[in-house]
Structures are given as C-alpha cells and as structure tokens.
Regions:
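Hydrophobic anchor at the beta1->P-loop junction of P-loop NTPases
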Residues: 3-5
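P-loop (Walker A) phosphate-binding loop of NTP-binding proteins
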Residues: 8
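Conserved lysine of the Walker
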Residues: 13
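N-terminal phosphate/diphosphate-binding loop that engages ATP/GTP or pyrophosphate donors
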Residues: 22-84
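Residue-level signal for inorganic ion chemistry
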Residues: 32, 74, 103, 117, ...
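ATP-dependent NMP and nucleoside kinases share a basic, alpha-helical "lid"
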Residues: 78-81, 85-153
Length: 221
C-alpha cells in the first residue's frame, strides 16, 4: 500500500506522515526534502537555480539518503534545508519542469513496491494518482505561519520562533502558495478523490487517527 499525503507548508504533513509510517512500519519519503536538497546541492556547486537543465542534472545524479535524516551526495543537510532561504530556493527549483520530471521518476521508483507513506504537493495528483489512500492536509494561514516559524527556527538552531517572525513567515508562505499553485508543472492542488483534512486546532494524534481509519477501510476486502 502507498499512502499519499499532500498539502501546503505548515499544514502538518511531515509530523503526520512520520507518525503514520512509524505505526505501520512503512518507509517515509518526504519529497519536499528532495527538492530542498537538490536546491542546496546546486547552490553549493555554484549552479544558478534559475537554470532548470543544470539543476535537473544535479537531481539526476544525486545520491539521496532519506532514512530518518536528509542527505545528498554524502552531505547531511537535514537542518540546512529547513530555513526561510531554502524555502525560496526550493520554490524556484520546483517550478522547473525538467527538475520535476527527474524527481517524479525517482519518487515513483521509491514508492512502486508499496509500504510507503509519501508526502509532498503532487503525490496524489501526479506522482501516484492511483494511490489507494490520498490525504490533503491544510490549516489556516495563521496556524501554518506559526508552525513554519517554529520549524525554521529549529532548523537554524534556535530554541523557538520569535513572535515578530511569524508575520514575515506568513508573507513568505503566501508567496510560496502562489508559486506552488500557479506553476505549470505539477501545481499544488486537491486531487478529486483525496480526503481533505483541516488541521487547524487539531492535535497530531487526532489527525493520525483519521488517516489510520481511512487506511483500515482501504484494507478491508
């Protein structure tokens, strides 16, 4: 079985996907981390992120390590890719059709055998439209901004999100949403047969319980 979890930044995809994967003993694949890692690697190789063909070459040659942490070509980038700057870099990289073509193919290889919880923005709509369980997580703009401010603070090695950063993060999220929803290749969208879950004010345990119920129903003969 493959479980597809989509949604915008700050909707809770990562926490929910990791928890479900642990409970089911499935592999967890964060496809957003792959785009971020490629952006990080290309930048450190001195490649212009606006050059889609060059960045696609990085994606094609990349050796990923997604087992608990995020690695690319021998570099552990788990924390380095969780910054506001990398949010923008990943958005730039994700708009290139050539990059998406390469990474979608690699993601399909990862999920083809099943036993995977895959999260991203186009899993249920493009990568695995035939997935038996498709979830779309969302939350209010304020809730998402608070979560992302906290996450990027942790990624930068800070103890917590500063209150005055939340507004800045909210603006960045608005720009990222526009980029994700209007890009020509695999835009962020709710797949017609996906289950929409609003996580605003809802605990992780409650969301996980909803998803696990869906998984149980899909497994029934």
């Amino acid at each position: 079985m493959l479980i597809a979890i989509d949604g915008p930044s700050g909707a809770g995809k990562g926490t929910v996907a990791r928890t479900i994967a642990t409970q089911l003993k499935f592999r967890h694949v964060d496809t957003g981390a792959m785009y971020r890692a490629v952006a990080w690697r290309a930048d450190h190789l001195g490649i212009d992120l606006a050059d889609g063909l060059a960045v696609a070459g990085v994606a094609e040659r990349a050796v990923f390590d997604l087992d608990g942490r995020v690695g690319i070509d021998g570099h552990d980038v788990t924390s380095a890719i969780r910054t506001t700057a990398m949010d923008a870099a990943a958005a730039t990289v994700a708009r290139h059709p050539d990059v998406r073509r390469v990474l979608v193919a690699r993601q399909r290889d990862m999920g083809r055998a099943g036993g995977v919880v895959m999260e991203g923005r186009d899993i249920g709509s493009v990568v695995f439209p035939e997935a038996p369980v498709k979830i779309y997580l969302d939350a209010s703009p304020d809730e998402r901004a608070r979560r992302r401010a906290r996450d990027t603070s942790h990624g930068a090695g800070q103890a917590g999100a500063e209150p005055d950063r939340v507004g800045q993060v909210a603006q960045a999220l608005e720009a990222r949403d526009l980029s994700d929803r209007t890009r020509a290749a695999s835009p962020l969208m709710l797949a017609p047969d996906a289950v929409y879950i609003d996580t605003t004010g809802v605990s992780v345990d409650e969301v996980v319980a909803q998803v696990m119920d869906l998984v149980a129903n899909r497994r029934l003969p």
